[in-house]
From Swiss-Prot:
General remark: On the 2D-gel the determined pI of this protein is: 3.5, its MW is: 26 kDa.
Record keywords, A-Z: Allergen
Source species: Liposcelis bostrychophila (Booklouse)
Domain of life, per lineage: Eukaryota
Designated name of the protein: Allergen Lip b 1
Amino acid sequence: AVLDTALSGIDKVLHGSIDAHKAD
């Protein structure tokens, strides 16, 4: 859970907030 949250945050930074919303 904690690691998943951290990875999610990194993913948003790498791909951008728009991409993050799309992926979600």
